[in-house]
Design a protein with these regions (language model features):
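Residue(s) in the substrate-gating loop at a strand-loop-helix junction
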Residues: 116
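Substrate-binding pocket helix/loop in short-chain dehydrogenase/reductase
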Residues: 72-73, 80-85, 111, 190
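Active-site helix of classical SDR
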Residues: 96, 132, 140
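Short C-terminal tail/terminal secondary-structure segment
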Residues: 121, 209, 221-234
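Short, small/polar-rich loop/turn modules that mediate ligand/substrate recognition or access, typified
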Residues: 148, 153, 220-222
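Canonical Rossmann dinucleotide-binding motif of NAD(H)/NADP(H)-dependent dehydrogenases/reductases
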Residues: 1-14
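Alpha-helical segment proximal to the catalytic Tyr-Lys
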Residues: 101, 145-146, 218
C-alpha cells in the first residue's frame, strides 16, 4: 500500500522484497524491483546501489520490513532473535547509512521507519519484535538529530495491529502462548486495549507515510507518531 500511494503521488519507487510479491507490486506501479534479503548487509547495499544507478539519487527511504515470532524469553530461539534484529533494526540502520550521502548532497531527504506501538510499550511473548521496534525508534531520533542541518527528516510511525499477513500469521501463536481459542485472539488481545475496536488498514499507514514525505510535514522530525486507535491513551 505504501509503494502504491507514493507512486500515485508521483514518486519513482524502488520495491525491495525477498519474494515475488514485491515484483508484482513494482510491475503494477511502474517501479523498479530489487530482490534481496534485508537480513544480509550485501543485499541492503545492492538495493541502494540499484536505486542510485537507476534514478541518480534517493529522496525518500521507507523501512517497512518485519516479521513476528511469539515465544517466551525462556524459549525464544537465539537464531530467531538475531534474525529479527537484523531485519528490523540493523537493515534500517544500513539503508539509512547508505542513502545518507545522496540525501545530504541534495540537502533533502525523508526517512520514515515503520515501527509499532510495541516500539513504545511492551507485551509478553514478543521480546525480539519489541526490542527491535524500540531500537528503531531510537535510531529514528538519532537520524533526526544528525539530519536536521542537511535537510533530512526522520520519523517513526507506530501503528497498532494492521490488517496484514503478519497479524494474520500470529493469531495461532498468540492463542497457544496465552491459552485461549484462536477466535478470541483478535477481540481479547489485539483489540481489547484500543479505544476504537478495529484493525488499522494498510491504506491508512500509507497515507501517513505520504503526509510525512510532503511539504506540510517539513517541520516534523524525530517523532514516534502513534496510529494506535487509542492503545497508548491509557
Amino acid at each position: 500500500a505504501i509503494a502504491e500511494r507514493l507512486a500515485a503521488d508521483g514518486a519513482q519507487v524502488v520495491v525491495a522484497d525477498i519474494n515475488d510479491k514485491g515484483a508484482e507490486v513494482a510491475q503494477a506501479i511502474g517501479g523498479l524491483f530489487v530482490r534481496g534479503d534485508s537480513a544480509k548487509r550485501v543485499d541492503c547495499k545492492a538495493l541502494v546501489d540499484a536505486a542510485l544507478a537507476k534514478y541518480g539519487t534517493v529522496h525518500i527511504l521507507v523501512n517497512n520490513a518485519g516479521f513476528q515470532h511469539v515465544s517466551t524469553i525462556e524459549d525464544f530461539p537465539e537464531d530467531m532473535w538475531e534474525k529479527m534484529q537484523a531485519v528490523m533494526l540493523t537493515a534500517p540502520f544500513l539503508l539509512t547509512r547508505y542513502c545518507w550521502p545522496a540525501m545530504k548532497a541534495q540537502q533533502w531527504g525523508r526517512i520514515v521507519n515503520i515501527s509499532s506501538i510495541h516500539g513504545l510499550i511492551a507485551s509478553p511473548n514478543k521480546a525480539g519484535y519489541i526490542a527491535a521496534k524500540h531500537g528503531l525508534v531510537g535510531l529514528t531520533k538519532t537520524a533526526a538529530l544528525e539530519g536536521g542541518a542537511c535537510g533530512i527528516t526522520a520519523n517513526a510511525i507506530c501503528p497498532a495491529y494492521v490488517r496484514t499477513p503478519l497479524v494474520d500469521n500470529q493469531v495461532a501463536d498468540q492463542a497457544r502462548t496465552r491459552g485461549i481459542p484462536e477466535a478470541e485472539v483478535i477481540e481479547k488481545v489485539m483489540l481489547e486495549p484500543a479505544a476504537i475496536k478495529r484493525l488499522i488498514e494498510p491504506a491508512e499507514v500509507a497515507d501517513f507515510v505520504a503526509y510525512l514525505c510532503s511539504p506540510a510535514a517539513g517541520g516534523i522530525t524525530g517523532s514516534a507518531l502513534t496510529m494506535d486507535l487509542g492503545w497508548t491513551a491509557r
